[in-house]
Swiss-Prot record:
Pathway field: Amino-acid biosynthesis; L-serine biosynthesis; L-serine from 3-phospho-D-glycerate: step 2/3; Cofactor biosynthesis; pyridoxine 5'-phosphate biosynthesis; pyridoxine 5'-phosphate from D-erythrose 4-phosphate: step 3/5
Residues annotated as binding L-glutamate: 9, 42
Organism this protein belongs to: Shigella dysenteriae serotype 1 (strain Sd197)
Main enzyme class: transferase
Name recorded for this polypeptide: Phosphoserine aminotransferase
Compartments, record wording: Cytoplasm
Cellular component, GO annotation: cytoplasm
Keyword terms of this UniProt record: Amino-acid biosynthesis, Aminotransferase, Cytoplasm, Pyridoxal phosphate, Pyridoxine biosynthesis, Serine biosynthesis, Transferase
Amino acid sequence: MAQIFNFSSGPAMLPAEVLKQAQQELRDWNGLGTSVMEVSHRGKEFIQVAEEAEKDFRDLLHVPSNYKVLFCHGGGRGQFAAVPLNILGDKTTADYVDAGYWAASAIKEAKKYCTPNVFDAKVTVDGLRAVKPMREWQLSDNAAYMHYCPNETIDGIAIDETPDFGKDVVVAADFSSTILSRPIDVSRYGVIYAGAQKNIGPAGLTIVIVREDLLGKANIACPSILDYSILNDNGSMFNTPPTFAWYLSGLVFKWLKANGGVAEMDKINQQKAELLYGVIDNSDFYRNDVAKANRSRMNVPFQLADSALDKLFLEESFAAGLHALKGHRVVGGMRASIYNAMPLEGVKALTDFMVEFERRHG
């Protein structure tokens, strides 16, 4: 079978080594004669999986001891509700920075539970889409927290700055599409959450990192399954967790550690992004409309000079083993998602195809 490179934005490509191990263990895991999908989440075998996954995740991100790590249901959208329901406390407003589609989605959900103070950080610089630097973000004095999304998968926009708003500002961030792709200073945040289906594992699992002093503030109406304190008190097993997703994510964490950890992923991701953006920037046939300072290294949207060629580009790229390159309906064009599991070889195959396609159709 020819090599396939999956550029899907999520559910995304998983490391080949992880899929191979999961395949080998699928019907007989740990010598039990059953699949990991069939064992009790409260049995000692799966408890070991859960504990190792949390330890490895903490190691990868250097999570401080005063932070809890929760393995949850509900995806990023579930956390759009969980964040205000858990950390508003007795306040009624929170700061929300709007830099793209997912930030706006979080704002829409938050309006059910509080009055968001929305700061529109989107700007245009020399005709390109960009984001105002953090020093220009206008935060309110009475907000319970400030929320933003460091990487917008649809817009292809990234905010790589580290928050520095003072110790009294609780920062909540949606890291779904950039978690584990670069080092982050967890201590600068109150809450970090990430859906698993991009850089962690398969869909169905969400990881939350929450500073322990923020526990115990949940609104009385907060569903128990979203209550950080209840999840923490029950070892993320208040109800049956998505065990297979948890197991596979644990394998991904071990793969990351065996391949140099987050620091090495950071280097490789930079190489991949530079290669792809380099082809786009050195061409009149392709374009990307995001300012260089805010370009995402995870999600690279691009357009062809002649949109009439879009269909042919997608057909020929798919035939060449380059899958899931169609852009989101909101933006159009193409989008290459190049998360940790995408090897440099895959991006090289894409750029070679792009150069050849331009030669034939430019």
